[in-house]
Structures are given as C-alpha cells and as structure tokens.
Amino acid sequence: MELIVKDAQSALTVSETTFGRDFNEALVHQVVVAYAAGARQGTRAQKTRAEVTGSGKKPWRQKGTGRARAGSVKSPIWRSGGVTFAAKPQDHSQKVNKKMYRGALKSILSELVRQDRLIIVEKFSVEAPKTKLLAQKLKDMALEDVLIITGELDENLFLAARNLYKVDVRDVAGIDPVSLIAFDKVVMTADAVKQVEEMLA
C-alpha cells in the first residue's frame, strides 16, 4: 500500500501488515491496560495491628471496670491502632508477549491511517531550539494536538516542543500504544516509517 508524503507530494510504499491490518480492539485494550498498569508506582503502605508501635499488654482487666472489654491498644477499632486490611506495596505490572505488543502497535497505526490521523512528511525539524519556531510550523500545518515521531531524536525539535501543550516529540524507540492513541494527530517522518516497519516486522 502507499501513503502520501505531505511535504514532498509523493507516495511512500509501506507494508500492508503494518499499516493496513484490521483493528483488533480487544488486543489494543489489553495492551494499553497492561502498559498503564506497568506505570503504576505501587508503593502505598499501611501498618497492620502487628506492625504499629504499642504495648502488647492488656489495657485493663477483662471484668469489673464497667468499660468495654479490650485486649490490645493496637486494635483497629482504637485510635492510632493498626489498619484492618492494610495496603502493602504491590507490583501491578502485567506480562505482554512481544507478538501481542507488536500486533497492538500495528493495529493502532492502521487505525490512524484509516482515520486520516497519521501524517507522513519527508523531514520535520526546526532551525533552532525555539518554541516560537515550532509553534508557527505547527500552525502552518493546522496542527495543535500532535505527536511527532522522527527517525532520530532531533535535539532542537525536542527542546522547542517541551513548552508546548499537547505536543510531544519521540524517536521510534520511544513510541508506545498509549502515546499513539493519546494525540489527535501523529506526524511521522519517512525515515521513522521505515524504522517502525523494521521494528514491527
């Protein structure tokens, strides 16, 4: 299949299996959920009655005081006692097979093509690391919410994009399922397209 290269007014031949496959919603959902789960910190922690500081002595005798019976100052019922079902640090990461991950990326890229959200350009750069230059370039292309993917990370482009809301710059190694679906448009250089095809082959 062929994709139009916007700034060169030519066509780029790409793999049907990478940019023209059916959208597998269930697979994409599973991979996106797994990716988001892997980003969770999982460091929350509370103390059980066994872990809080306090005496193990019975506060008062069982009978005869008129007060409710109590066996420990560390009881979850008491102020400064332990937590009944205390949260502990957890690893939330999920295993995703390479084949599934690659399949999800291909599905997303193919859907971007179908929805006209993927824009191919011959090259994409700015002369200096100035936000103003990139903002004007994007305005000329009628782009606001955009992910820019280049073959190699252009430092000028990266620095120029840092202060722009809803604009991100990645190289091919930095793409992931969540970032691909998070932006309205994805701009990809011809060099990046070839690298993506090799990576997902």
Curated annotation (Swiss-Prot):
GO cellular component, one term: ribonucleoprotein complex
Disulfide bond annotation, renumbered to this chain: none
Single GO MF descriptor: rRNA binding
GO BP field: translation
Pfam families (UniProt xref): Ribosomal_L4
Taxonomic superkingdom: Bacteria
Keyword ATP-binding: no
Alphabetic keyword roster: Ribonucleoprotein, Ribosomal protein, RNA-binding, rRNA-binding
Region (Disordered): 45-67
PANTHER family: 50S RIBOSOMAL PROTEIN L4, LARGE RIBOSOMAL SUBUNIT PROTEIN UL4M
Quaternary data: Part of the 50S ribosomal subunit.
Function: One of the primary rRNA binding proteins, this protein initially binds near the 5'-end of the 23S rRNA. It is important during the early stages of 50S assembly. It makes multiple contacts with different domains of the 23S rRNA in the assembled 50S subunit and ribosome. Forms part of the polypeptide exit tunnel.
NCBIfam families in the cross-refs: rplD_bact
Similarity-based family: Belongs to the universal ribosomal protein uL4 family.
HAMAP family reported for this sequence: Ribosomal_uL4_B
UniProt name for this protein: Large ribosomal subunit protein uL4
Organism: Yersinia enterocolitica serotype O:8 / biotype 1B (strain NCTC 13174 / 8081)
